[in-house]
Amino acid sequence: MKTLSIEPLTRAAFAPFGDVIETQGAKQIPINLGTTMRFHDLAKIDVADEGGRPLVNLFRGQPRTLPFEVTMLERHPLGSQAFVPLTDRPYIVVVAPAGDLDASKIRAFVTSGWQGVNYAKGVWHHPLIALGEVSDFIVVDRGGDGRNLNEQNLPESLWLTDDALLAVGA
């Protein structure tokens, strides 16, 4: 069984794949007569290719149990895809760089709970891996014509395990 190591989600580690959406380290702008803090420009939403438009959706992820077998990844070649959790439950993100899928470059991250992610256009990723309970996410992605989904099976399964999750203190 080939196990994926799991890393804590940080902006620096995730930068090759897109953006981490979080308030920590974000530019803050007080608005509305100082009664609201705006955390500004948290992700680069990129959905305009081939006349695309932004969609705002709610995804309800069923919890996955570990060990969890990763057998495939998907990508959206025409637009980014942002996931913003509506709870503070950690979830796992599995990604690989854009371009031809190279299974040796697959990485896994665990969020702190409130962190969101924005997958850059063309980045390979696994569908939502919620942990513990049913979890809701606001998802901003692309609507419009054109084929914006590719799925690819991995040459061999990779596993996410409790031990790998515990190794990062999650």
Swiss-Prot record:
EC id: 4.3.2.3
Cofactor dependence: Ni(2+)
Record Pfam families: Ureidogly_lyase
BP GO terms, sorted: allantoin catabolic process; purine nucleobase catabolic process
GO molecular function annotation: ureidoglycolate hydrolase activity; ureidoglycolate lyase activity
Keywords from the UniProt entry: Lyase, Purine metabolism
Keyword Lyase set for record: yes
Oligomeric and partner information: Homodimer.
Described purpose of this protein according to its UniProt entry: Catalyzes the catabolism of the allantoin degradation intermediate (S)-ureidoglycolate, generating urea and glyoxylate. Involved in the utilization of allantoin as nitrogen source.
Family membership noted in the UniProt record: Belongs to the ureidoglycolate lyase family.
Protein name from the UniProt record: Ureidoglycolate lyase
